[in-house]
């Protein structure tokens, strides 16, 4: 598929989005998709109130898509000025030999599949047969849900009762929206899932237990007909520990281990053009580059552990001086960066002076006072982040050469 053929997708009545997985940027949306987006970005479609997915980051889908696994995401779209849910099937295609794209194709539920009242109010679990043995003895929590009765839970196996902490009678008096942290917002999502054939990758939710605690869960849900009742079978897997480890790894990838500040890698990620637009700071922002004066002397004379104390104390001082929305990074060694959204040069200079004065007051046991030099620059026109950084680095160099413990503008 090449660029000049994208317009042919406008002939389709189903919505189609073509997305670059690595930049997570929308390449093309056909007319049906644009109608559902209104003023929303594709990122907002994936993170809206009705949005559910297996993975937050699109590159994590690539292996499964290459192996032709069935992957579904539910997006939050606009219909008649109201937000609602839309199921999409994901497919991997090669735009070029080196550039794969993920195609999100909307799955519109046929009108004949509207939810109809079932007989599940009279549902009685039978103790014999394959289904009963499978349901009762399975070690995974399982729920039978009736979407047509407001998400009523009509049966739960022993593993589910143990997981949620309810007895069978209480569990079967509940609706799925009562155990899902989305509350009633889960109903349009359930409506979408009830139309899918099953077999797709699981979706992630947060469920609430009887004791009030919450757990991250992965749910395999699909339609099933049992004893003449058209229900949904939901298999629940607790992924709380997995999520905790993922969050720890993600934090480690984006943050400096010693100071806890954002790291240089995250700075470059945030200042990518697409990210800057998302943060609404593409033009009007300033940059501070802060260097600890005579830091090598501190390390040589007092030891590296004291040097680490200086860096951590400086990090906390920068955080305390930063305003809401400012971003603080450890650049490397004894250098730090502040990204100041919607900040003109004079305001940035004033903040830099506040930082300089505050740092000079920091007291660390066993050490003399230390100071910082700060370069300041405001983004100009269409200059790149590298061009801006060179200007602020030059300003810092002049501040160091002019005697240190001072603030200079580019």
From Swiss-Prot:
Substrate binds at residues 299, 304, 308. Binds 1 Mg(2+) ion per monomer. GO terms for cellular component: plasma membrane. Part of a signaling cascade that regulates curli biosynthesis. The cascade is composed of two cyclic-di-GMP (c-di-GMP) control modules, in which c-di-GMP controlled by the DgcE/PdeH pair (module I) regulates the activity of the DgcM/PdeR pair (module II), which in turn regulates activity of the transcription factor MlrA and expression of the master biofilm regulator csgD. The lineage of its organism: Bacteria, Pseudomonadati, Pseudomonadota, Gammaproteobacteria, Enterobacterales. SUPFAM superfamilies: Nucleotide cyclase, PYP-like sensor domain (PAS domain). GO terms for biological process: cell adhesion involved in single-species biofilm formation; negative regulation of bacterial-type flagellum-dependent cell motility. Keywords: GTP-binding, Magnesium, Metal-binding, Nucleotide-binding, Repeat, Transferase. GO terms for molecular function: diguanylate cyclase activity; GTP binding; metal ion binding. The gene is dgcM. SMART domains: GGDEF, PAS. The active site is at residue 334. It catalyses: 2 GTP = 3',3'-c-di-GMP + 2 diphosphate. This is Diguanylate cyclase DgcM. The keyword Magnesium applies. PROSITE patterns: GGDEF (PS50887), PAC (PS50113). Residues 3-70, 129-198 form the PAS domain.
